[in-house]
Amino acid sequence: DTSEFDPLANKEYTEEQKQTLEQEQKEFLSQTTTPALEADDGFIVTSASFAQSTPSMSVLSGNISPSQTSDPITKAVRETIIQPQKDNLIEQILKDLAALTDRDLAEQKRKEIEEEKEKDKTLSTFFGNPANREFIDKALENPELKKKLESIEIAGYKNVHNTFSAASGYPGGFKPVQWENHVSASDLRATVVKNDAGDELCTLNETTVKTKPFTLAKQDGTQVQISSYREIDFPIKLDKADGSMHLSMVALKADGTKPSKDKPVYFTAHYEEGPNGKPQLKEISSPKPLKFAGTGDDAIAYIEHGGEIYTLAVTRGKYKDMMKEVELNQGQSVDLSQAEDIIIGQGQSKEQPLITPQQTTSSSVEPPQHKQQVPPITPTNQPLQPETSQMPQSQQVNPNLLNTATALSGSMQDLLNYVNAGLTKEIDSNKQIDLIKEAATAILNNEKSDIVEKQANIIALAENTVNNKNLKPDAKVAGVNAVLEIIKNDQNTPNLEKSKMLEATVAIVLNSENLEPKQKQQMLEKAVDVGLSLKDDASRAATIDGIKDVVIKSNLYTEDKGTMLIAVGDKVNVSELSNAEKQKLLGSVLKKGVEAQVLSPAQQQLMQQHLDKITAEQTKKDTIKKVNDILFDPLSNTELKTTNIQAITSNVLDGPATAEVKGEIIQEITNTVAGSSLEAQDKAEIVKGVGETIATHSDTSLSLPNKALIMASAEKGIAESKTNLPDRELMTKVLVDGIYEGKGGPEITKAVSSGIDNSNINDSEKEALKKAKDAASEAALDRDTQNLTEGFKGQNIEEHKPHDDIYNKAREVINAVNPVIEALEKSKEPVVSAEERIVQETSSILNNISKLAVEKVNNLRSMLSPNGNLKTLEEKKEESIKKVDELVKAFGTKSSTEEQQSFIKTNLIDDKTLSKEVRLQTIDKLLQEQKRAEAIENPSFKTEDVRVVSGKSKLKPISKDNPDIEKAKMVVGRDRVNIKGNIKIMGALMNARDIIQSENLNKSTPIKRE
């Protein structure tokens, strides 16, 4: 608490005045005799008519409040004690800033002090800003400054008490308190305080507590036994009489006696006249730092002054009530948490503790016998028996020291001294860490501490761990991380309060000069891990926001700040949080880092990549959900499903993501479709639609290489699906069909092979899928070749007036050669007519087109199948002839008509793996072989079998007994044939030919509709 340093006067001291004041202080300290009032309790009262009106300033904010007044006593305390102490403190802070490594921060704080001095000489804003606490605490560590502050306090109170004493003639001035013992109890005393008019203002009650000794630790680690202290029931509200009142109660030594008269220490309560004339508690003056011998409301206050321990006549609970009343009477809203913050600040030393000396004597105490003013403690004459649940035997470091729970019953400083003593003695880092964990557990399990005090104590423990010189760097990391783990596992601390502890711990770590950046990063990462493990998103967000702000405001170099933010982002990125929450947290870290200019371009790019990946994962998840909704919609048929999934595919391709991310999403789409429970043909149609959508997508928004990349991902999704291999083969085929129907180039088709190669399946499955892909490509190329041939059909180049583009092209050629023809005619050389020239040139063009088409198709095959899986046209022709011969030979092995008919259906009609041309050529050859040899040998004789089948010949029954056997008008040689079987086979062959010729190769296998 800095209340004793708050600006409470507007007076600016000149150098001469400062020297005079210092001289007065030295004189006061050198006095061998002093008035009796200095070492006694005293009070001063004034009536309303006597109080002087001076500007009053808030004890908390330091702002002048014109509506309130302050009497001369309060003003004197401010001017002779508080302001000189603040001046010396600022002087030390400026010295510390001059030596600070972070020159930017040092200059910023120096300017802050200088600029505020011009507006407010008391620097109320600076001292009231929690961000400046570390500079104040560091200055207070200076031994010379502490001596100065103590001397100012002693001399100042002497001056005030002497100046405003009744003995010096000051009306209503300070006078000793006349305590009167209660007859019924010698440890109870009381006194009535009256104003100068004789009206009672209040009755003060004093209770002396005599107890068996308990131990308090000093800053140097030595311990002092307290056997007696007192409590005074300071009034909170006064409503009896008018006037002002100042109660100045001397602090007692450790044995309960008053201090020597040359070093009195006072706790003063200032009650000033309020608007209704009644005294109001406006201010409390006490030495700094004020501590409490326990965590409950009944814990007694004590201070260390001049190397000695003094107890003050106020408990923690009473002090809380008094501070809340001060807030009320200063016109501020009452907030319990704010009041407790102030109390905790005064109750705990922020100064770096020293190691407790090893020669410390055994100090164990037992609970006081009166009202239990302090927590239960062990009697002096009994050995310490720590609870095993709090401190296992293996963790005991010094039997002459208190355990953590007992040490904490005194004060946080006692606990730190105990821990430091153990860390000094114990060289095993594991046992050192166990001791730190034990202390953290004791702090959080202390039922008498409120959450604010627990926060402050945990932070103090972390700071102590970081700064302890007996811990190796790795042990410091492990120690702080152990504290963070204790925070994580504590079941009683609310998540938002845990978040504050984590943030404060990171601030201590990052601003420490005793750690390397690597060690700081390890502790920061642990804090982030703990923060991300909190159970609600608000606490997680608060932790990350707080930590990133701490990083940016730390005294680290800019480069190190960027590294720390990257570490925060990495932890968020690898966490198990939802993608939506990751997006929010990582986005906020990136945004803050860019705004604060602590992230390098490379770091920004790296974090943006992580953010893009998370965004892609979320997009992928959302997309697949939509796809599943479509697939399992019972009201939509396959055609509608295909249309809707094509629309989703198109949206993905148009999205802002990279081609790689788009490929990942498309892969998930095809994988989801392939793995669905739909019929194989239904899945095939949907996949075909996806392939066609990719192939036909605008080249301006999606380049050809990116299309190929995405198409490979589409096939990979199919290949890696859990459906059976035949279904995957079918979907691979129709994916290729979709590419061709979408006019996709060979690069897109070739990408299908790449997708198969990159898939995580076994080699045999890869080979099967490649064959399916090549078969689809073969069929597509055959269609293209056939379409090219069909385009030439009907172009009778012998006609005098050819039509279509070929004729027009030939006409262009003739127009070009006409001048040559005319020149030849003039030379009277024989020439051909124009029409003949057209025919010749057209024939030449068609020959060239045919050659180019063959060459183009062969090149295309080579490109699509670099491994030679697709054959050239010449190779395909040879293969077709060979296959036809094999089929004809196989047919000849079938002896019965039924076997031959079955062969025709199975091998020529149903087997679609054979090309259309091979099957038709086989049928033609089989039909030729059905003709009789005599007819074949005599080409001039028309065989009747053709006319019979075509219906041009009239057949008559051979006999009345067999009317179904008709007489065939045909020449029969010496080897007679089975006329009836022959006719059936020829009919079956011609029927098969009709079926094959009617096949529509431009459409895939018909799909089942729902």
From Swiss-Prot:
The keyword Heme does not apply. Keywords: Cytoplasm. The keyword Transmembrane helix does not apply. Residues 347-372, 379-396 have a biased composition (Polar residues). It is found in: Cytoplasm. It holds the Pfam family 120_Rick_ant. Residues 1-34, 347-396 are annotated as: Disordered. Residues 12-27 have a biased composition (Basic and acidic residues). Its main location: cytoplasm. One of its GO terms (cellular component) is cytoplasm. This is Antigenic heat-stable 120 kDa protein. It comes from Rickettsia parkeri.
